[in-house]
Amino acid sequence: MKNSFWLFGSHHYVITDPHNTDLEYDQVEKRSKPGVKTPPHIHGGYTELVYVIEGQMTVHTKKGSITLYNGQYFFIPKGMPHSLEATQKQGITRTLQTFAPAGFGLLLTQFGTDSPENIPPVESIDMELFEKLSGEIGDITLGPPGGSL
């Protein structure tokens, strides 16, 4: 299985192959430059745990925003609208994200752009295809990358 992908301006490395866990969970290390923000979205079929290894990541929800620093984590239950934003001033933010049951790692293998880790591709996101594939695992995209909730 290929395990290194780019999506929405961040490099994702699938650490735990979901097929090796009987689809119980998958884990992804995400590396983001300052200012990179996901589209607002909902995971309808799985939970997400975001753990900051290095840098800072802000989790935006309808209840407000919380900034996480090295060693801190945030649990996102199924159905919670959210987006993630790398809010450090410089350098790379590294997070470990665990999805249970497996979900996002599967989506990355279907949709992520294959590219060497340190060479970001020129991404041309086919949002219609992304929404179709993410919808198959229960995800709902609520707006464009960088959009607000």
Describe the role of every protein-language-model region.
Residues 11, 56-58, 65, 81:
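Structural motif
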Residues 109-149:
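Acidic/histidine-enriched, glycine/proline-rich intrinsically disordered or flexible terminal extensions
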Residues 14, 27-29, 49, 65, ...:
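Conserved hydrophobic/aromatic beta-strand scaffold that supports enzyme active sites
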Residues 21, 78-105:
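Ligand-binding loop in jelly-roll beta-barrel domains
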Residues 20, 63-81:
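Short acidic-glycine-tyrosine-enriched beta hairpin
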Residues 61, 69-70, 85-86, 107-108:
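Short glycine-/acidic-enriched loop or helix-start segments at secondary-structure transitions
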Residues 2-40, 46, 98:
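A short glycine-rich, His/Asp/Glu-containing loop-to-beta-strand
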Residues 45-57, 62:
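Glycine- and acidic-residue-biased ligand/ion/polar-headgroup-sensing regions
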